[in-house]
Amino acid sequence: MTETTENTVNLPYRNPELPTEERIADLLGRMTLEEKVGQMMQLDARSGDLDDLIVNKHVGSILHTSPSDLPKAVETVNAKTRLGIPLVIGDDCIHGYSFWPGATIFLSLIH
């Protein structure tokens, strides 16, 4: 069990009653340099190694993860990260779905 699930529940950055600026200052003050750098990264998750991306690299966003891995990504953030910062999960609809074997690619106009 990590600090996230036990000790961060009542910290200022998790309190929606406080002003946003105060919550941000509190969270940034708790983050390590590695966590701050990681939060600025968006990495390809097709490898399936979500623990490495989320826990070791502290990524703020992942691309191209399998829909079946989404619950695992959320659970990894909640159970294995120090501060429980939510993860942004995205996919590139114009050509990103073509990364998956057998995916249907529909034509799309780009103006």
For the regions a language model picked out, list residue spans one by one.
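N-terminal beta-rich core of secreted/periplasmic extracellular enzymes
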Residues: T2-I110
